Amino acid sequence: MAPEPKLRPTGLPSQEQVKELLDGEFARAGYEIENVVIDGGARPPRITVVVDGDRPLDLDTVASLSRSASEQLDRVDESGPGVTADAATYVLEVTSPGVDRPLTTEKHYRRARGRKVELTLSDGSQLTGRIGALTADGESVSLVVREGARANFSVRELPLEGIVKAVVQVEFSPPSQRELELTGQPREEAGA
């Protein structure tokens, strides 16, 4: 199999090049690049960098990361081999994964602590609850589940391998203080 070309036919950098260029700077800011999407067919072409971190991605951070990414990519445009002048015009977007991204790794669960999620378990059952702490070994997560119509809660420990699907839910009202306490996270940290 032939090696992947360094540059896409559009003259834009490859996903790997963008990741290599930006990884260090984004990591210093506390964020990890989860995905890079290059759309050379769009007019103008689009480079989307999806980042996630332990802290929520706010607008100031997006602006700072975007400026940094733009500077890094502009340097490649000016000096990089094979990057064409046409490639210098592109839309750069730095974004978070979005609320609809399923939680699939231990770090996703850690970052979602305090958030409401809908889970599908390996036995086919479904649960809705609030993500609590991970066990020290990172193999299980606690889930704060509402019991009955009253505001009674229980904490269930679930092995991550027994969770088939987990998606963060959009909330329009803040959780109760008791529910947050059971996640082990103060209200301020949960973004309430």
UniProtKB/Swiss-Prot annotation:
Pfam families to which the protein is assigned, alphabetical: DUF150_C, RimP_N
Signal peptide start and end residues: none
GO aspect biological process, one term: ribosomal small subunit assembly
UniProt KW Cytoplasm keyword: yes
Main location: cytoplasm
GO cellular component terms, semicolon-separated: cytosol
InterPro entries assigned to the protein according to its UniProt record, in alphabetical order: Ribosome_maturation_RimP, RimP_C, RimP_N, RimP_N_sf
Entry annotated with the keyword Cytoplasm: yes
Localisation: Cytoplasm
Alphabetized CDD domains for the sequence: YlxS_C
Keyword annotations from UniProtKB, A to Z: Cytoplasm, Ribosome biogenesis
Family assignment from sequence similarity: Belongs to the RimP family.
Function of the molecule: Required for maturation of 30S ribosomal subunits.
Name assigned to this protein: Ribosome maturation factor RimP
Organism per entry: Mycobacterium sp. (strain KMS)
